[in-house]
């Protein structure tokens, strides 16, 4: 192991070691150079912050809540959104207490109905019986309860497809446009303007981005869904323009569905055995407008990187594991609609947050504007288990000794534990490829093995009762840089 580390360290030194979230791999790069470059691909501060937060709430809310469907038609009467009150304080208390750090609201789903009083469409909550502004209310509650706020804005828009004067796929040409477009009687407090070559729908979309980013911030995440009920007129999205606007107005925000964060590949809470954040792209992600859904089991292993056709780009792109607490994304009823158990939520949390990804758990409010007692009870129990398990590191006070293979720990008193947590120093790149946990019981005995580490790796195994344990690094891309090792007991 020591010899391997010295070899890789020498390789890194010879590469002049520039780092960044994207590095090119040249056609003549040797295998060892490819792996050395992969180590130097590191997250942006915004990506690192999102990863370290780990746990976020998804809130699907809108006309579908009242019609009982998952995807609306775009021709719904706004009056179906018959909301009397939205108790966004209740939402945020529940989210905070379970340990979530961020809330993402569906400000506009595929139906095109907007939850805020937009200057640019009449198809929204402002045309419904509800006189409030759900986006504003939730953003205020997030600030009150110490949560970050983000929004989901669907590129798909069935209303703009179906309306007689709809802008989606209307065949308009890209011409010089100013964002935001001035609307008489509705000035912006933020007086900045931006010029782009846009068609009608991209202008409409960016005007709404401007509203959300300037009037409801600070915004920590912008969520772009890749799903489309259907398309029309060959409509293309000018994501590079969207990105420029987001970076200008919300420089601390990450963008989901593009180069900052990617989809985990399913909506069922399944996780990969090895979730790598450094993955290969055939094109430079900085110039890409569309990002395909990545569903392969292996996205970033050594074998995957070394079989990628050159040249290519190595890019840092963490996964978000999005899953709903209910059977469906929107609330339908409190009788027949299934709700996940606390066991299930705790299991998904351990596998996602503890598997080098971010957990985005959807908790949809009902027609009364509140989160159902069924959902809140599950979250309260799952939150209790997370706090009681992961709030007590059993290795505090241990004597640690670095070895040629990893690290050995000796406790003053025997501990009972069945979880091991490793974290890497993200500023030093993804290095560990596999590791083993050994315990001392009349000699060293291997208990469990894990794959890559990244931000956080939680290893689960049968309960142990020991005074000594060690972590052996079985394979690594460079000298391991572990930030922490912890042990816990899940009852």
Where does each model-flagged region fall?
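Extracellular Ig-like/FN3 beta-sandwich strand-entry sites
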Residues: 464-466
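Mature catalytic domains of secreted/periplasmic carbohydrate-active enzymes
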Residues: 19-461, 472-483, 488-489
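Sec-dependent signal peptide recognition
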Residues: 2-7
């Amino acid at each position: 192991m020591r010899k391997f580390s010295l070899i890789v360290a020498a390789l890194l030194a010879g590469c002049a070691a520039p780092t960044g979230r994207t590095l090119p791999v040249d056609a003549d790069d040797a295998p060892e150079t490819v792996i050395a470059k992969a180590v130097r691909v590191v997250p942006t501060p915004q990506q690192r912050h999102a990863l370290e937060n780990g746990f976020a709430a998804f809130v699907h809310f809108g006309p579908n809540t009242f019609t009982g469907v998952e995807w609306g038609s775009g021709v719904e009467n706004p009056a179906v959104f018959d909301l009397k009150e939205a108790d966004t304080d209740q939402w945020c208390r529940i989210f905070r207490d379970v340990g979530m750090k961020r809330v993402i609201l569906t400000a506009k789903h595929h139906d095109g109905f907007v939850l805020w009083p937009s200057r640019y469409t009449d198809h929204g909550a402002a045309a419904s019986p509800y006189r409030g502004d759900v986006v504003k209310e939730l953003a205020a509650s997030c600030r009150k309860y110490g949560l970050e706020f983000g929004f989901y804005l669907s590129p798909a828009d069935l209303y703009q497809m179906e309306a007689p004067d709809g802008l989606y796929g209307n065949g308009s040409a890209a011409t010089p446009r100013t964002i935001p477009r001035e609307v008489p009687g509705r000035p912006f407090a933020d007086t900045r303007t931006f010029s782009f070559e846009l068609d009608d729908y991209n202008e409409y979309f960016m005007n709404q981005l401007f509203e959300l980013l300037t009037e409801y911030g600070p915004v920590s995440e912008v969520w772009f869904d890749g799903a489309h009920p259907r398309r029309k007129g060959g409509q293309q999205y000018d994501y590079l323009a969207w990105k420029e606007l987001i970076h200008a107005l919300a420089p601390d925000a990450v963008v989901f569905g593009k180069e900052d964060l990617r989809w985990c590949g399913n909506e069922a809470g399944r996780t990969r055995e090895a979730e790598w954040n450094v993955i290969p792209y055939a094109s430079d992600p900085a110039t890409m407008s569309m990002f395909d859904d990545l569903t392969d089991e292996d996205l970033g292993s050594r074998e995957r990187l070394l079989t990628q056709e050159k040249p290519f780009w190595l890019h840092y792109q963490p996964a978000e594991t999005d899953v709903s607490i209910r059977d469906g994304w929107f609330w339908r009823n409190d009788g027949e609609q299934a709700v996940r158990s606390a066991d299930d939520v705790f299991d998904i949390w351990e596998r996602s947050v503890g598997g080098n990804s971010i957990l985005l758990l959807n908790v949809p409010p009902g027609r009364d504007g509140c989160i159902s007692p069924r959902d809140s009870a599950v979250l309260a129990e799952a939150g209790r288990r997370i706090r009681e398990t992961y709030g007590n590191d059993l290795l505090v006070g241990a004597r640690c000794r670095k070895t040629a293979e990893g690290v050995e720990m000796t406790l003053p008193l025997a501990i009972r534990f069945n979880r091991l947590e490793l974290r890497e120093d993200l500023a030093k790149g993804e290095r560990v490829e596999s590791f083993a946990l050994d315990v001392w019981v009349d000699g060293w005995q291997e208990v469990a093995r894990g794959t890559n580490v990244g931000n956080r790796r939680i290893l689960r195994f049968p309960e142990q009762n020991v005074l000594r344990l060690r972590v052996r690094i079985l394979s690594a891309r460079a000298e391991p840089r572990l930030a922490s090792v912890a042990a816990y007991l899940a009852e």
